[in-house]
Each structure stands twice: as C-alpha cells, then as structure tokens.
From Swiss-Prot:
Signal peptide bounds: none
Protein name: Putative glutamine amidotransferase HI_1037
Residue ranges of domain Glutamine amidotransferase type-2 in the record: 18-266
Ribonucleoprotein among keywords: no
Matching Pfam families: GATase_4
UniProt keyword terms in alphabetical order: Glutamine amidotransferase, Transferase
GO molecular function terms attached to this record: transferase activity
Keyword Transferase annotated: yes
Organism: Haemophilus influenzae (strain ATCC 51907 / DSM 11121 / KW20 / Rd)
List of catalytic residues: 18
SUPFAM superfamilies for this protein: N-terminal nucleophile aminohydrolases (Ntn hydrolases)
Matching Gene3D superfamilies: Glutamine Phosphoribosylpyrophosphate, subunit 1, domain 1 (3.60.20.10)
Superkingdom of the source species: Bacteria
Enzyme Commission number(s): 2.4.2.-
Length: 294
C-alpha cells in the first residue's frame, strides 16, 4: 500500500515497541534530515526513550554510536548532526524496552561477524520462548530477545553455508530462519552487511525511494523542511526504511506482515509481498498517532 498526501487521511492510535530507521543508497549520503525527525520520537513526539543507537558502514568497517539515554536528549545523538557522516548503509534504532534492562549492552543496533564481514541488526518487537542457545557458539552479550534472535540467525547462516553464498541464497536463507523466529512474536527488523540492506515486517514498516526529480520533503515530527534538489545529483538513489513515515508529502509504501525487501545501491532488487494482518496489542507501550490512508 502506498501512502501519500492525495489520500483521504484519518488519525488513529497505534501501539508499538521500538522504532527502526534504515538508509540504503548508491552514493555516500548523510541521514541527518531523517534522523533529526526520528530522534524526536524518543521522548518528544513519542515515548521510545530507553536508549538509541546508529551504525554507519564505511567500507568494510562500521562506525557505531550507542547511548542508554533518550535520543532526543543525548549529546551523542547531537554528534550525528554535527559530524554529518555519509554512508551507503545506515541502521538506527530508538528503544522502548520490553525485555532486558536499560543499559548499553541492550541497546541496538547489534553487530556480529559473518563470513568475514560486519553484519548490523536492529529489531522492533517482542519475542518469547526463543530456542535455547546455551550450547551455541554465538552468544548474546546483553539480555534482550532481539540480540538472542540475531545470534540465532547468524549461527543458522554460518551453519548453512561454510563460505559466503550468493546474495539471493542469503536472502532466501534469511526468509527461512525469519519465518521460524517470527513464530515467537513480533519480528520487524533491518539487517545489513554494508553491501545491501534487508528489511522484514511483522506489523509496521514503511519505505520511500528517493530519486530524480528531487523536491522538498516535510517532516512529520517537527515540520522540518529540506529541498533535496539542492543536495542530490541526477543519478542519486536513496531508500529510507522506518517504522512509521517520517515525512508527510512523500509516497511511502507500507509493508505487510511477512513481507521482505532487499535493497542494494539504492535499488529494490527483490521483494516478498506480505499479507495484510490486523495488529495485535501484546501489552507493550508506545503510542503513536500518525496519518494513514483509508
């Protein structure tokens, strides 16, 4: 479903846990405009105040920032605007804790090595009764269901392929392991190895694809405005993936339950269409009022 300003809209209240933000593009790009709106949801326009993190891929390396303070107040979050870091793949997360204490080790995104590459993962949801990993090689450092699920996924991939397989083999394997993990609860996530970005939706995830002709974008959370035509070149392509739309005048695509998207170099190279499903309130807090189509 594509959401845009030409639709008839209504306001409604949604309960969510954490929120996710990802960016994949074909030229190094900063995420400041999107992140400045996103971080306001950590205590100002929403209640995701239990820490934040953001990871930038730089070649084969990853520059990662985390804080157990709310992103809206964190001086570490201020650095993102000041330093204007550019990257091809970025993953950010603001936390509303469901499992695990509020501390650095439980703050997303999480990072693991797979086939000699850094893999970065952030999750929105609540997973219960995950498989026991006591005897597994990869262990979570913190106490979140999210990190445990990522470790399970990473170990599954390493056990399935001794050497790095093709991208489509990776995509298919991630679909398979995700379907099993999603049986344990809500499993929205964004995942990247610096070459591509994969997103999976259980309940709420949206994306927008920006390319020429570029125009103005108006943020939802603080009415900030940017004219991308001043900054972007004709061949630039940028995908933004997030829990809820960050702008009110762009055409956002809503993913459905069980849906996957695979982005690389600013292009959507593969997609699995999900099935519309009514969201079930599992008791977690995090109320969000947004515009949506009817």
């Amino acid at each position: 479903m594509v959401l845009n300003h030409s639709h008839i809209v209504r306001l409604y209240l949604i309960k969510v846990m954490c929120q996710l933000l990802g960016m994949n593009c074909n030229t190094p790009t900063d995420i400041v405009f999107s992140f400045e709106g996103f971080r306001r949801r950590a205590g100002l326009t929403d209640c995701h105040s239990d820490g934040f993190g953001i990871a930038f891929f730089e070649g084969r390396g990853v520059r990662i920032f985390r804080d157990n303070q709310a992103a809206s107040l964190s001086p570490i979050a201020d650095c993102i605007k000041q330093y204007n870091i550019k990257s091809l793949n970025v993953i950010a997360h603001i936390r509303k804790a469901t499992q695990g204490e509020v501390n650095i080790e439980n703050t997303h995104p999480f990072i693991r090595e797979i086939w000699g590459q850094n893999w970065v993962f952030a999750h929105n949801g609540n997973l219960k009764n995950l498989p026991d990993m006591t005897d597994h090689f990869l262990q979570p450092i913190g106490s979140t269901d999210s990190e445990a699920a990522f470790c399970y996924m990473a170990e599954y991939l390493k056990n399935t392929f001794r050497k790095k397989p093709s991208e489509m083999e990776i995509f298919e394997a991630i679909q398979k392991v995700t379907k099993g993990l999603a049986q344990h609860g809500t499993f929205n996530f964004i995942l990247s190895n610096g070459e591509w970005m994969i997103a999976h939706c259980s309940t709420n995830l949206h994306y927008v694809m920006r390319k020429a002709p570029f125009g103005k974008a108006h943020r939802i959370d603080d009415d900030g405005v940017i004219d991308f035509s001043y900054y972007a070149k004709a061949g630039d392509k940028v995908n933004i993936i997030t829990t809820f739309p960050l702008t009110k005048n762009e055409s956002w695509t809503k993913m459905e339950n069980g849906g996957f998207v695979f982005f690389k170099n600013g292009e959507k190279i593969a997609e699995v269409i999900g099935t519309p499903k009514e969201a079930i309130d599992d008791g977690t807090l995090g109320n969000r009022t947004i515009n949506s189509a009817i």
